[in-house]
Amino acid sequence: MKICLIDETGAGDGALSVLAARWGLEHDEDNLMALVLTPEHLELRKRDEPKLGGIFVDFVGGAMAHRRKFGGGRGEAVAKAVGIKGDYLPDVVDATAGLGRDAFVLASVGCRVRMLERNPVVAALLDDGLARGYADAEIGGWLQERLQLIHASSLTALSDITPRPQVVCLDPMFPHKQKSALVKKEMRVFQSLVGPDLDADGLLEPARLLATKRVVVKRPDYAPPLANVATPNAVVTKGHRFDIYAGTPV
């Protein structure tokens, strides 16, 4: 995949070249999207909109730390949707990991989560965030046990995953309504890189075959159900809903 690669570390140790080789990235000076290695982290920038800033994965500080410490925990919509109750903490595959937020929430309340991400740039950002998270004194121990990354396309990888999880989560990129200059800066940068998941409808069936208990699909409130398969079961929040489908028992 082509992207502009920028090293701002000043270390001169070739770390960016190693990273590019690992994720199959090719430097393209004219690309509007840039993957930047800073002294602190790896980040994604949209070069024609510098005001948007850089997007990076941070499990240790910022919004994620706040959500972990002060968020709803088991009361969060995604936790309710996967069916966490009492001692039941399902094994989860997050088949469209994105920046790992929902996966991290589930891991922080005790679920073991395997994240799948097919876009190599997003996978590189996740991997960088995980490495820093694993090294953190406060959360590193449980994070290593509960949150892992698999760089693979969900469409091909879902049939190969063992052991089967109890729950599969899907959150395909859906085109945002035009009116939203409100669309978060992050979404704008992200959509420029990834675009809408045009093949997302093909994920529902393999996800249902893989999950032993249920599939949870996160949708904007205005979006139709995935693959136009309606379900009466959903956890509804402001702006989103988590549609719930039966999996395939062992």
Swiss-Prot record:
Cellular component annotations (GO), alphabetically ordered: cytoplasm
UniProt binding sites for S-adenosyl-L-methionine: 101-102, 117-118, 153-154, 171
Q: Where in the cell is it found?
A: Cytoplasm
Keyword Cytoplasm in record: yes
Q: Which InterPro entries match?
A: 16SrRNA_methylTrfase_J, SAM-dependent_MTases_sf
EC numbers, comma separated: 2.1.1.242
Keywords recorded for this protein, A-Z = Cytoplasm, Methyltransferase, rRNA processing, S-adenosyl-L-methionine, Transferase
Provide the reaction this enzyme catalyses. Answer: guanosine(1516) in 16S rRNA + S-adenosyl-L-methionine = N(2)-methylguanosine(1516) in 16S rRNA + S-adenosyl-L-homocysteine + H(+)
GO MF, any single term: rRNA (guanine-N2-)-methyltransferase activity
Role: Specifically methylates the guanosine in position 1516 of 16S rRNA.
Q: Which PANTHER family match?
A: RIBOSOMAL RNA SMALL SUBUNIT METHYLTRANSFERASE J
The UniProt similarity line reads: Belongs to the methyltransferase superfamily. RsmJ family.
Q: Which NCBIfam families match?
A: PRK10742.1
What's the protein called, per UniProt? Ribosomal RNA small subunit methyltransferase J
